Each structure stands twice: as structure tokens, then as C-alpha cells.
């Protein structure tokens, strides 16, 4: 009788350990790695759009709407990534459903921002100013391309978060 109770206790103890430690193996490191990559993309995009958005006096490289959309996309998701990573350091968990919603929102916003930045780049390229300021146009094109990469990172992070959340590996 005592041995069957211990067997049940062992199974219960394993379940408690899984709940306590939340996830095991590599799966607990996947979301923070995505957040680090997303944070790096946001920092680089902010650096790339700063010059074409703010330092062009005579020629407009980016419209005010595109600049506002870019800053209001990159900065908040940069802050959210920092908060997420800071929470991981303090061992606080973000619910996977909330994280999935934020990833979906970030994917949509990054895609819209990339479309606007590349649209402004295309319009500036087709104006045929001579001599063209290719450095600012390269910064703008690079920011648009990195915004697409950021959107793909958020999409992959969304898929991974949903899969791990449904499996129960993350809360």
C-alpha cells in the first residue's frame, strides 16, 4: 500500500516540478532569443531612418506620416522587448496569449511600416533629382528591408509562441 502511494507521489511530484520550472530544455530559451533579435532589428531601423527623416532640409526623403508610423512602431516594440527580457531576468512570466497578441500586432505594424518606407523610397528614387543623395536613400531602403525582416521575426515568434503555449511548455 505504501509503495503505490509513493508511485503516485512520484508522478505528482514530477507534475509539480514541471509547473514550477515551467519548461525544460531548449524551449525556454527560444522566446528570449527572438526578443533579442527583434530588439536588435528595432535599434538598427531607428538608426537607419533617423538621417533621412530628420536631416533633409531641401529634399523630402520621408513623409511626416511615414516617419511618425516608423517611430511609433519601432520604439514601442523596442520598449516591450526590453520589458520582456527584463521580466525574464527577474523570472516573471508573460502569458503566452498576451505575447501572441503583441507579436501579431507587431507583425502587422512592421509590415505596414516597411510598405510605407519602401513606398517613400520608390517615390524619392523616381523624382530624378540630380545629384541624388544616395546615402540617405540607402538608409531608407535598408530600414524598409530590415522592417520586413522584423515583421518575419515577429511572425515566426508568433508561431513558436502559439505552438509552445498550446503544448503547455510556456504559460
Language-model-detected regions and their locations in the chain:
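Intrinsically disordered terminal tails
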Residues: 1-35, 44, 51-62, 92, ...
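Signature of small four-pass
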Residues: 31-45, 49, 63-124, 143-164
Amino acid at each position: 500500500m505504501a509503495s503505490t502511494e509513493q508511485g503516485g507521489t512520484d508522478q505528482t511530484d514530477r507534475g509539480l516540478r514541471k509547473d514550477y520550472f515551467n519548461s525544460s530544455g531548449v524551449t525556454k530559451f527560444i522566446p528570449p532569443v527572438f526578443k533579442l533579435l527583434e530588439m536588435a532589428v528595432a535599434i538598427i531601423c531607428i538608426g537607419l531612418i533617423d538621417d533621412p527623416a530628420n536631416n533633409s532640409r531641401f529634399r523630402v526623403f520621408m513623409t511626416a506620416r511615414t516617419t511618425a508610423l516608423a517611430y511609433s512602431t519601432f520604439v514601442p516594440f523596442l520598449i516591450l522587448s526590453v520589458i520582456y527580457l527584463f521580466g525574464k531576468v527577474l523570472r516573471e512570466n508573460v502569458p503566452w496569449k498576451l505575447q501572441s497578441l503583441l507579436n501579431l500586432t507587431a507583425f502587422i505594424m512592421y509590415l505596414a511600416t516597411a510598405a510605407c518606407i519602401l513606398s517613400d523610397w520608390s517615390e524619392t528614387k523616381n523624382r530624378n533629382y540630380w545629384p541624388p543623395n544616395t546615402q540617405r536613400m540607402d538608409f531608407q531602403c535598408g530600414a524598409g528591408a530590415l522592417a520586413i525582416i522584423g515583421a518575419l521575426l515577429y511572425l515566426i515568434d508568433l508561431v513558436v509562441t502559439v505552438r509552445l503555449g498550446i503544448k503547455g511548455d510556456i504559460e
